[in-house]
Amino acid sequence: MKKENTLLRLIFAVALLLIVNFNVMGDTLRKGGSIVGKIESNGDVRINGSIVGRFESNGDIRVGGSIAGKIESNGDIRKNGSIIGKVEQNGDIRLGGSIVGKVESNGDIRKNGSIIGKAEQMSNVRRVAVMYFFGFFNL
């Protein structure tokens, strides 16, 4: 397990490129900046790069790169690439890639790829497949 975590950190240790401005510990992080670790935001956030670590937002999250870690949002999460880790949110999830980990949603999950792990939702699931080691099940 320790070897896998180290490998994931090496693979996903890339810079975050933030399109919108938001405050991180009193400073404004602009396009071209980078941060690794825990990020909290009260507004909508759009990231062209990847996320490594924990990310919390009260608004929508839009990510262009990969995510390795935990994402929590009270808004929508929109992602085209893959997610490795845990996703919790109260809004909709719209993903074009795959998820490796756990997904908890109070909103709709709209997915074109596969989920390897566990998916729990309180609302509708559209075009979602859950793959386990013992078989393949459509929700």
Regions inferred by a protein language model and the residue ranges of each:
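Long terminal segments
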Residues: 2-52, 57-62, 66-68, 73-74, ...
